[in-house]
From Swiss-Prot:
GO terms for biological process: negative regulation of canonical Wnt signaling pathway; protein ubiquitination; regulation of dendrite morphogenesis; ubiquitin-dependent protein catabolic process. The keyword Transferase applies. This is E3 ubiquitin-protein ligase HECW1. Residues 870-901 form a coiled coil. It comes from the Eukaryota. It comes from Homo sapiens. The lineage of its organism: Eukaryota, Metazoa, Chordata, Craniata, Vertebrata. It is an enzyme of class 2 (transferase). Pfam families: C2 (PF00168), HECT (PF00632), HECW1_helix (PF18436), HECW_N (PF16562), WW (PF00397).
Length: 1606
C-alpha cells in the first residue's frame, strides 16, 4: 500500500521531513522511506542521465526553464555538484568521485556533506569533507562509503550537498545516489513465538550527572556568555532500535551569568536510558538582552551511553570532553567536565515479561493506570537525588492489564509514511501486519503489575520533553465486573486539578498519545516527535555501541518486542512530562487560561511545533459531551497524568450558543465508533502548523495539513482530527497585534466571532445531530478499498455521500487501524437536483438547497419537501440559524487542493448560504471557484482550473507589487484600509499566498474595498457581463471561467503596469540571481512578505506571466530601504522631534531595519509608525533603495534596470556597499556641474603633459617614482598620457584606463600591506593599521591620494572599493555610529544595542579597548584615566563616540591624513565638497555590475553587422552564458577597464569624448577577436558557428594582455 503514497503531491512532501516513526526512529529506516517523484531531485537537464525516472529507461527528459534564468542557452552558468555514479554498492563498487563547479564565491571553509535524500537541515549530515584550501571554483574529491549504521536497509538514497563556508548557503546538490548494502538485516513480521526469544541481553540504566563545569567557552564581542546546559537522551543515531518513552528526556541547568568558565554547583540530573542511546549535552548562551546580537550556540557533546558505561567500569567517574560543533563552520571552543554515576540498573533477567496469550484477571485498582490517575493531579516534584532510586527491580514485576469480554490488543498507530493493513486476529491474540509494515509491532501484553512508585517520580525520570515520544496509558473502562461511575467521577476531579499544570507543560511537549479503552479493548497509540540531530559521532563508535548492546540470539525484531513490552508494562510509561524548568519563562504561551474562562474541558492531543507552540487542543463547546464521545460509555474520559483532563458528564459545556443544548448524559448512540483522534505523527519539520483559538472553537487535534495521512483513528470528540484541520483554514482573523500571529503562526478568532453551531433542537439522540456525529468519527464497517490511496489531505468522506445513522445502537468493535481519506461514509445515493453537500468548520456536513436558498442538517432524499428544509418550531432558533450562517459566510473555508492529494474530495464553503443575505450568483461564484480544487494539484485538469482562477482581476490586483502604490493614491480606500484590522489581515494573507483569496473572496468588506478602485467609466473586459440580482445588486459574470463575482473586474494593475497617472512613481527593482538553496523569487517580489511560498502558487504563476516585464519596486520595499539609511534617525527627528523620546517607536524602526519586509508587515497596523511614515511620503517614493549594502548578492546596474547577473564573482562583492544616491537627478546634475567646473578651471587640460612610461612588471614602483616627482600644479593642470614599455599603442585614453585599472588592483590590494579588507565577508578595503610597518608608508599613502585625485579629474574609474568611512575621510566629514555598519556589522550592532538600551548593572566596561598587535593583546585607554572610568548610562554616549572614533581611526590617523593630503594636492576641495560619501564613491569607483540590457542597447555595429545578425545573436548569447567575472573581463578587453560609469554604457568614454561600445565585422574566421580600447571597439570575425565564436571569444578575453599599434 505504500506505493500509493507516490501519488501524494510534492508540495507537501517536505512537510513530513521531520516525522519520526514508532517503528524505527532512524532517518534511513523503513519509517523514513519516501515515495517521491524523481523529478524532485533533479537540478538541471544535464543531470538526468544520473536518474532513473520511475524505473524507466534513461531517456531524455525536459523540464520547464524558469523565465528568470539568465542563461537561456545552456545550464553551464549554474553551480553544479556531480557524482560519478548514481548507484553504489558497499564493499563492491569503486569509490565515488564528487565533482564541483561553483559559479558563486568560494571559500577555503566550503564543505560537502552527505545527506539522506529527504534531509533539509544542513546540520544533519551523515558525513562531511572539507573541500580544501585551494580556493578553486572547480575540483573533485574521492568519497569512500563504508558499511555503517547509516545504511541499515538494503537500499538507501542519499545525496551530496555543497555549502559555502562563510554564509552557510547551499551552492549545489547532486542527484540522488542509491547505496546498496547487501549485509543489511531484513525485517520480517513477528509471530507469537518470537516474543519470548532472547530477552536477557537488554538493560535500562538509571544514572545521574552532576558536578558540571565548562572551561574556555567562546566569548562574544562585548559580553561574556551566560551559559546553561540542555541535556537530553536520544536514540542512537540511525539506530536500528525504536524510539521508546524514555527518549527525549530533557533537563536544563541553571544559568551561570557572565563567564566563560561556568561551574554548575549542587545540580544533579537523573536519566534512564539504554546503552545504545546517546547523551546529548548542548551548551547555550541565554543572552536575555532585548536584541540578541550573537549566536547562542556555544558547543555540544554527543556521547553514547555505552562509552560512559565503559569509562565507569574502569573507575572513571569524572569525565571530560572537548565540545563539538553542529556545522563544520561553527566556531566552538572549550571543554565540558561532569561526573557520571550509575544509580540503578533494570536487568531483563529480573524483569521477565510474560507474553502469554492466556487472559489473566486483575483488579483495576492494582493497575498502573489507576496508580497514575491517583497521583496525576499533584505537582511534579522537583528533582532530588533519591528520585533516581525509584527504579528498582522489585517494583516492576509482572503485571496484567484488565481484559474485557472480547479480546484485548494493543495497537500501535502507524507512522505517517507507512500505510499497512492491520487487522485484528480474533481470539488468538495475534495481529497480522501488512506486507509494507516492516518495523510495526502489534502484540498482546497481559501481565500482573505489582505496586508501583508514584507517577510523579516516574514522570520525573521519564521526562518526556521537547523532543520526546510519548506513550501515555489512559485508564479506560473497567472490566465487566467493575462499575464505571466512580472512575468517571475520579476522572472529572483529576481533570480539574491538573488543568493548570497541564497548560504549563504543554509548551514543548511532543505528540502525546493515549491508550484508551472502550468495550474492554485497549488501543495503544504511539507517536514520535524528535528533531533530527547532527551526526557528531564517528561511524565506528556507533557500530561499537550497537554491537556491544546486541546479543547473538536476539534479533532487532525480538529486541523491539521485549524492550517495548518491558517499558509499557511499567507505570513510568504512563507518566506525563514533568514541567520544563526553563522553557516556561522563555517560550510564548498563546493560550493561557482560555480553557478555564470558557469552560472547555477536553484536551485530547498535544501537537507542539517548535516554531508554533500550540496549547489549544480542546473540543468545541458545540460538541455536547453526552453525544460527542463515541467509544466511551457514559461519555467519561480518564485524565492524563499531567493534567490533560476531560470533564465527563458532570461538567456541562459552555459556549457561545450551546447553552440551550440539553445534556444527553445517558445517550450513547455513537458509542464505540472511534476512540482517539491524535495523529501518530503530527509533527512537521517544514510547515507552520496553524491553529485557531477562540471562545467558540477549540480543536482537539493537530491542525497541520501533514498530520493527516490517512491512517489515524477518528476523533472521540465532536469532530475528527481530520475535520478539525479545517479550523485552521476557516477562522477569521483577530484584531490583536499581527506580530503574535507571525511569531506563532496562529490564526486567532476574537471572542465576538462565533463559530457555527448545530441546531439545538436536533440534539435529541437519534435525529440529524446523530447523523452528523457519526460522520466525523469514521465508520466501523469499512472496506479495505480505502487503503488504496492514503493521502496527505484533510478529507475522509466521499463527495456526495452522507453519514449512516446509528440509531443509538452501540458498536462492539473499534475500527481497525487503516487509512481514511474520505469525509463521507459509503452511501452512493446521489443528492436530489439543485442540492449540494458542504462541510462547516467543525467538520459537520450540511446541505444547501440552491432553489430555496436554505440549508439543513438532514440529508435530502429524492422526495424532499418543496421548501427543502425542516423548519424549526421556534422563531428564536430560526434567528439563531440566520446569525450563525451569517458567520459561516465569513468564517467557513475549505482546505487547499494540495492537501486533498488526489482524493478529489470537494470541500466547499456556504458562501451564499441561507440566512446570510447571499444570492444565487454569490453561491455560484463560490461553487465555481471552489470547484477548482476537486482534482489533485498536479493534474492537468487542476492546472487548468488554477490558470482560470489566476485570471481573476482581484487576485492580480492584490498580489501585484504595486498594490500599495495604487492604494496610497486612493485616499478613500487608504482610509478604509488603515481603519479596518480585518481588511488588513485579509489583504496581507492574500498577498502572502494568493490561494487564500478563495477563503475571503465573498467577504463583504473585501469586495467593497476592491470595488473602490474600479473605474466604472471603462468598458468591461472581454468575456465579462454585468447583471442585477433580485435585490437590485449588481454582479459580474465571467464567461471565460464561467464564474460570477461581486468584484468589479475594471480594477487597475491587470496588465502588470500602473495606471498612467501613477507611472511616475515606478522605480524599477533589481532582480537577483538565485542559486541552489536560496529563496524563491516569488517570495522576494511579493510586496508584503518575504516568506517563501510553494512554487506553484498563484503568485508564482502571476510572477511567471509577467517575468519579461520590468516589475516595479513594491512600496514596502521602498519603506524598508528608506529606513535603512545610515542617518535615518536624524532625518526622522527633523520632522518629528518627539522621536528622540519615543524609545518604543525607535525600537520598531530598528526592528524594520533588521527584519526588512517581514518586520514591516508585522508592524503595518501600528498607528505611530504609520503616522511617522506618512510625513515622508514623497521622500519614500523618490528614494532609490540602498539595496546592495544590505543584500550583497544584489546586482546594481547603472540605471537600476532589471538585470540578472547569473553569478556574483568574488570581485563583484567588493561593490556590496555601493549604491546610487537617494536623489538620482540631483546627483547627475552635481556630476555634470563638477566636470564642467573642472574643465573651466583648467584641471587636466594642458597644454603640459604628464607622460608616464610604465613597465608592466614594475607597475607600482615605476608609477610611484614618476608621479611623486611631479609638482602639485603639474598634477592639476597637465594632461595625462600613459605608455607601456614595449607596446606601441597610442594613448587615446585606452592605455590610461587600463593603467588605472591595473594600478588600483595592485596599490589597493590588501596583500601589499597598505590596505586591508574591512571584514571577512566583504571585499571593501580600508587603511590597514599594519601599514605603519611598511617602509616609507606615509609617502605611499600620499601617492595613493594623488592617484585617486588623478583618476577623478581625468574621469577614469578605479577598480577598488573602499568603506564608507574612507570616503568620509576624503571629504573630511566626521564619522558617526551608522558608518560602522559598513565597516563591521557586528561591532555596529553591539554599540547600537548599548545606545538603545539601559546598561545599568548589565555591562562591566571601562573606557579602554583591547588591541592585538602581532598576536600580543594590549589595553589602550580611550581617554585619559579611562581604565578607571566605568561606562554608565550617563556617559555611554561619550563611550560610543570614542569607540566609533577608535574603530575608524585605530592606528591609521597618520596614514589617513597623508592620503587626504595627497588627494587634495590634485583636486580642489571646494569642488569635491558638493558630493556626499556615497556620491563620491560612485564618481571614483563607478559600479562593477553588468547590465546586459543596457550594454546591448548602447552597442553600435559596423561592417555589415546589425542587432539581428546571426553572428551578433551568437555573440550576445555567449555574453549571457558568461558569468559576471567573464563579462567584466570582456569589457576590460574591449574598453580597458572593467568598471562602468554611473550613467551606464551610454556614458562610456573614448579618446575624444563619449564613445559607445562597438562591434565591427572584421577578419578571417581563423583569427581571434581584436579590441581597440581607445575607441571601445571589438573586431569580430564572422564565425560560422556558435561554438567557434564562443571558444574564440573566451580565448581572447582570458589570454590577451598587451596592446599593439595598427
Amino acid at each position: 500500500m505504500l506505493l500509493h503514497l507516490c501519488s501524494v503531491k510534492n508540495l507537501y512532501q517536505n512537510r513530513f521531513l521531520g516525522l519520526a516513526a514508532m517503528a524505527s526512529p532512524s532517518r534511513n529506516s523503513q519509517s523514513r522511506r519516501r515515495c517521491k517523484e524523481p523529478l524532485r531531485y533533479s537540478y538541471n537537464p544535464d543531470q538526468f542521465h544520473n536518474m532513473d525516472l520511475r524505473g524507466g529507461p534513461h531517456d531524455g527528459v525536459t523540464i520547464p526553464r524558469s523565465t528568470s534564468d539568465t542563461d537561456l542557452v545552456t545550464s553551464d552558468s549554474r553551480s553544479t555538484l556531480m557524482v560519478s555514479s548514481s548507484y553504489y554498492s558497499i564493499g563492491h563498487s569503486q569509490d565515488l568521485v564528487i565533482h564541483w563547479d561553483i559559479k558563486e564565491e568560494v571559500d577555503a571553509g566550503d564543505w560537502i556533506g552527505m545527506y539522506l535524500i529527504d534531509e533539509v537541515l544542513s546540520e544533519n549530515f551523515l558525513d562531511y569533507k572539507n573541500r580544501g584550501v585551494n580556493g578553486s571554483h572547480r575540483g573533485q574529491i574521492i568519497w569512500k562509503i563504508d558499511a555503517s549504521s547509516y545504511f541499515v536497509e538494503p537500499e538507501t538514497k542519499i545525496c551530496f550537498k555543497y555549502y559555502h563556508g562563510v554564509s552557510g548557503a547551499l551552492r549545489a546538490t547532486t542527484p540522488s545516489v542509491t547505496v546498496k548494502n547487501s549485509a543489511a538485516p531484513i525485517f520480517k513480521s513477528i509471530g507469537a513465538d518470537e516474543t519470548v526469544q532472547g530477552q536477557g541481553s537488554r538493560r535500562l540504566i538509571s544514572f545521574s550527572l552532576s558536578d558540571f563545569q565548562a572551561m574556555g567557552l567562546k566569548k562574544g564581542m562585548f559580553f561574556n556568555p551566560d551559559p546553561y546546559l540542555k541535556i537530553s537522551i536520544q536514540p542512537g543515531k540511525h539506530s536500528i532500535f525504536p524510539a521508546l518513552p524514555h527518549h527525549g528526556q530533557e533537563r536544563r541547568s541553571k544559568i551561570i551569568g557572565n563567564t566563560v568558565n561556568p561551574i554548575w554547583q549542587a545540580e544533579q540530573f537523573s536519566f534512564v536510558s539504554l546503552p545504545t542511546d546517546v547523551l546529548e549535552i548542548e551548551v547555550k548562551d541565554k543572552f536575555a538582552k532585548s536584541r540578541p546580537i550573537i549566536k547562542r550556540f556555544l558547543g555540544k557533546l554527543s556521547m553514547p551511553v555505552q562509552r560512559l558505561l565503559e569509562r565507569h567500569a574502569i573507575g572513571d567517574r569524572v569525565v571530560s570532553y572537548t565540545l563539538g560543533r553542529r556545522l563544520p563552520t561553527d566556531h566552538v571552543s572549550g571543554q565540558l567536565q561532569f561526573r557520571f554515576e550509575i544509580t540503578s540498573s533494570i536487568h531483563p533477567d529480573d524483569e521477565e515479561i510474560s507474553l502469554s496469550t492466556e487472559p489473566e484477571s486483575a483488579q483495576i485498582q492494582d493497575s498502573p493506570m489507576n496508580n497514575l490517575m491517583e497521583s496525576g493531579s499533584g505537582e511534579p516534584r522537583s528533582e532530588a537525588p533519591e528520585s533516581s532510586e525509584s527504579w528498582k527491580p522489585e517494583q516492576l514485576g509482572e503485571g496484567s492489564v484488565p481484559d474485557g469480554p472480547g479480546n484485548q490488543s494493543i495497537e500501535l498507530s502507524r507512522p505517517a509514511e507507512e500505510a499497512a493493513v492491520i487487522t485484528e486476529a480474533g481470539d488468538q491474540g495475534m495481529v497480522s501486519v501488512g506486507p509494507e509494515g516492516a518495523g510495526e509491532l502489534l502484540a498482546q501484553v497481559q501481565k500482573d503489575i505489582q505496586p508501583a512508585p508514584s507517577a510523579e517520580e516516574l514522570a520525573e525520570q521519564l521526562d518526556l520533553g521537547e523532543e520526546a515520544s510519548a506513550l501515555l496509558l489512559e485508564d479506560g473502562e473497567a472490566p465487566a465486573s467493575t462499575k464505571e461511575e466512580p472512575l468517571e467521577e475520579e476522572a472529572t476531579t483529576q481533570s480539574r486539578a491538573g488543568r493548570e499544570e497541564e497548560e504549563k507543560e504543554q509548551e514543548e511537549e511532543g505528540d502525546v498519545s493515549t491508550l484508551e479503552q472502550g468495550e474492554g479493548r485497549l488501543q495503544l497509540r504511539a507517536s514520535v516527535k524528535r528533531k533530527s540531530r547532527p551526526c557528531s559521532l564517528p561511524v565506528s563508535e556507533l557500530e561499537t555501541v550497537i554491537a556491544s548492546a546486541c546479543g547473538d540470539p536476539e534479533t532487532p525484531r525480538t529486541h523491539y518486542i521485549r524492550i517495548h513490552t518491558l517499558l509499557h508494562s511499567m507505570p513510568s510509561a504512563q507518566g506525563g512530562s514533568a514541567a520544563e524548568e526553563e522553557d516556561g519563562a522563555e517560550e510564548e504561551s498563546t493560550l493561557k487560561d482560555s480553557s478555564e474562562k470558557d469552560g472547555l474541558s477536553e484536551v485530547d492531543t498535544v501537537a507542539a511545533d517548535p516554531s508554533a507552540l500550540e496549547e489549544d487542543r480542546e473540543e468545541p463547546e458545540g460538541a455536547t459531551p453526552g453525544t460527542a464521545h463515541p467509544g466511551h460509555s457514559g461519555g467519561h474520559f480518564p485524565s492524563l497524568a499531567n493534567g490533560a483532563a476531560q470533564d465527563g458528564d458532570t461538567h456541562p459545556s459552555t459556549g457561545s450558543e450551546s447553552d440551550s443544548s440539553p445534556r444527553q448524559g445517558g445517550d450513547h448512540s455513537c458509542e464505540g465508533c472511534d476512540a482517539s483522534c491524535c495523529s501518530p505523527s503530527c509533527y512537521s519539520s517544514s510547515c507552520y502548523s496553524t491553529s485557531c483559538y477562540s471562545s467558540s472553537c477549540y480543536s482537539a487535534s493537530c491542525y497541520s495539513p501533514s498530520c493527516y495521512n490517512g491512517n489515524r483513528f477518528a476523533s472521540h470528540t465532536r469532530f475528527s482530527s481530520v475535520d478539525s484541520a479545517k479550523i485552521s483554514e476557516s477562522t477569521v482573523f483577530s484584531s490583536q497585534d499581527d506580530e503574535e500571529e507571525e511569531n506563532s503562526a496562529f490564526e486567532s478568532v476574537p471572542d465576538s466571532m462565533q463559530s457555527p453551531e448545530l441546531d439545538p433542537e436536533s440534539t435529541n439522540g437519534a435525529g440529524p445531530w446523530q447523523d452528523e456525529l457519526a460522520a466525523p468519527s469514521g465508520h466501523v464497517e469499512r472496506s479495505p478499498e480505502g487503503l488504496e490511496s492514503p493521502v496527505a489531505g484533510p478529507s475522509n468522506r466521499r463527495e456526495g455521500e452522507c453519514p449512516i445513522l446509528h440509531n443509538s445502537q452501540p458498536v462492539s468493535q473499534l475500527p481497525s487501524l487503516r487509512p481514511e481519506h474520505h469525509h463521507y461514509p459509503t452511501i452512493d445515493e446521489p443528492l436530489p437536483p439543485n442540492w449540494e453537500a458542504r462541510i462547516d468548520s467543525h467538520g459537520r456536513v450540511f446541505y444547501v438547497d440552491h432553489v430555496n436558498r436554505t440549508t439543513t442538517w438532514q440529508r435530502p432524499t429524492a422526495a424532499a419537501t418543496p421548501d427543502g428544509m425542516r423548519r424549526s418550531g421556534s422563531i428564536q432558533q430560526m434567528e439563531q440559524l440566520n446569525r450563525r450562517y451569517q458567520n459561516i459566510q465569513r468564517t467557513i473555508a475549505t482546505e487547499r487542493s494540495e492537501e486533498d492529494s488526489g482524493s478529489q474530495s470537494c470541500e466547499q464553503a456556504p458562501a451564499g448560504g441561507g440566512g446570510g443575505g447571499g444570492s444565487d450568483s454569490e453561491a455560484e461564484s463560490s461553487q465555481s471557484s471552489l470547484d477548482l480544487r476537486r482534482e489533485g494539484s498536479l493534474s492537468p485538469v487542476n492546472s487548468q482550473k488554477i490558470t482560470l482562477l489566476l485570471q481573476s482581476p482581484a487576485v492580480k490586483f492584490i498580489t501585484n507589487p504595486e498594490f500599495f502604490t495604487v492604494l496610497h493614491a486612493n485616499y478613500s480606500a487608504y482610509r478604509v484600509f488603515t481603519s479596518s484590522t480585518c481588511l488588513k489581515h485579509m489583504i496581507l494573507k492574500v498577498r502572502r499566498d494568493a490561494r487564500n483569496f478563495e477563503r475571503y473572496q465573498h467577504n463583504r468588506d473585501l469586495v467593497n474595498f476592491i470595488n473602490m478602485f474600479a473605474d466604472t467609466r471603462l468598458e468591461l473586459p472581454r468575456g465579462w457581463e454585468i447583471k442585477t440580482d433580485q435585490q437590485g445588486k449588481s454582479f459580474f459574470v465571467d464567461h471565460n471561467s464561467r464564474a460570477t463575482t461581486f468584484i468589479d473586474p475594471r480594477i487597475p494593475l491587470q496588465n502588470g503596469r500602473l495606471p498612467n497617472h501613477l507611472t511616475h512613481r515606478q522605480h524599477l527593482q533589481r532582480l537577483r540571481s538565485y542559486s541552489a538553496g536560496e529563496a524563491s523569487e516569488v517570495s522576494r517580489n511579493r510586496g508584503a512578505s518575504l516568506l517563501a511560498r510553494p512554487g506553484h502558487s498563484l503568485v508564482a504563476a502571476i510572477r511567471s506571466q509577467h517575468q519579461h516585464e520590468s516589475l516595479p519596486l513594491a512600496y514596502n520595499d521602498k519603506i524598508v530601504a528608506f529606513l535603512r539609511q545610515p542617518n535615518i534617525f536624524e532625518m526622522l527627528q527633523e520632522r518629528q522631534p518627539s522621536l528622540a523620546r519615543n524609545h518604543t517607536l525607535r525600537e520598531k524602526i530598528h526592528y524594520i531595519r533588521t527584519e526588512g519586509n517581514h518586520g514591516l508587515e508585522k508592524l503595518s497596523c501600528d498607528a505611530d509608525l504609520v503616522i511617522l511614515l506618512s510625513l515622508f511620503e514623497e521622500e519614500i517614493m523618490s528614494y532609490v533603495p540602498l539595496q546592495a549594502a544590505f543584500h550583497p548578492g544584489y546586482s546594481f546596474s547603472p540605471r537600476c534596470s532589471p538585470c540578472s547577473s547569473p553569478q556574483n564573482s568574488p570581485g563583484l562583492q567588493r561593490a556590496s556597499a555601493r549604491a546610487p544616491s537617494p536623489y538620482r537627478r540631483d546627483f547627475e546634475a552635481k556630476l555634470r556641474n563638477f566636470y564642467r567646473k573642472l574643465e573651466a578651471k583648467g584641471f587636466g587640460q594642458g597644454p603640459g603633459k604628464i607622460k608616464l612610461i610604465i613597465r608592466r612588471d614594475h607597475l607600482l614602483e615605476g608609477t610611484f617614482n614618476q608621479v611623486m616627482a611631479y609638482s602639485r600644479k603639474e598634477l592639476q593642470r597637465n594632461k595625462l598620457y600613459v605608455t607601456f614599455v614595449g607596446e606601441e599603442g597610442l594613448d587615446y585614453s585606452g592605455p590610461s584606463r587600463e593603467f588605472f585599472f591595473l594600478l588600483s588592483q595592485e596599490l589597493f590590494n590588501p596583500y601589499y600591506g597598505l590596505f586591508e579588507y574591512s571584514a571577512n565577508d566583504t571585499y571593501t578595503v580600508q587603511i590597514s593599521p599594519m601599514s605603519a610597518f611598511v617602509e616609507n608608508h606615509l609617502e605611499w599613502f600620499r601617492f595613493s591620494g594623488r592617484i585617486l585625485g588623478l583618476a577623478l579629474i581625468h574621469q577614469y574609474l578605479l577598480d577598488a572599493f573602499f568603506t564608507r568611512p574612507f570616503y568620509k575621510a576624503l571629504l573630511r566629514l566626521p564619522c558617526d555610529l551608522s558608518d560602522l555598519e559598513y565597516l563591521d556589522e557586528e561591532f555596529h550592532q553591539s554599540l547600537q544595542w548599548m545606545k538603545d538600551n539601559n546598561i545599568t548593572d548589565i555591562l562591566d566596561l571601562t573606557f579602554t579597548v583591547n588591541e592585538e598587535v602581532f598576536g600580543q593583546v594590549t589595553e589602550r585607554e580611550l581617554k585619559s584615566g579611562g581604565a578607571n572610568t566605568q561606562v554608565t548610562e550617563k556617559n555611554k554616549k561619550e563611550y560610543i563616540e570614542r569607540m566609533v572614533k577608535w574603530r575608524v581611526e585605530r592606528g591609521v590617523v597618520q596614514q589617513t591624513e597623508a592620503l587626504v593630503r595627497g588627494f587634495y594636492e590634485v583636486v580642489d576641495s571646494r569642488l569635491v565638497s558638493v558630493f556626499d560619501a556615497r556620491e563620491l564613491e560612485l564618481v571614483i569607483a563607478g559600479t562593477a555590475e553588468i547590465d546586459l540590457n543596457d550594454w546591448r542597447n548602447n552597442t553600435e555595429y559596423r561592417g555589415g553587422y546589425h542587432d539581428g545578425h546571426l553572428v551578433i545573436r551568437w555573440f550576445w548569447a555567449a555574453v549571457e552564458r558568461f558569468n559576471n567575472e567573464q563579462r567584466l573581463r570582456l569589457l576590460q578587453f574591449v574598453t580597458g577597464t572593467s568598471s562602468v560609469p554611473y550613467e551606464g554604457f551610454a556614458a562610456l568614454r573614448g579618446s575624444n569624448g563619449l564613445r559607445r561600445f562597438c562591434i565591427e565585422k572584421w577578419g578571417k574566421i581563423t583569427s581571434l577577436p581584436r579590441a581597440h580600447t581607445c575607441f571601445n571597439r571589438l573586431d569580430l570575425p564572422p564565425y560560422p558557428s556558435y561554438s567557434m565564436l564562443y571558444e574564440k571569444l573566451l580565448t581572447a578575453v582570458e589570454e590577451t594582455s598587451t596592446f599593439g599599434l595598427e
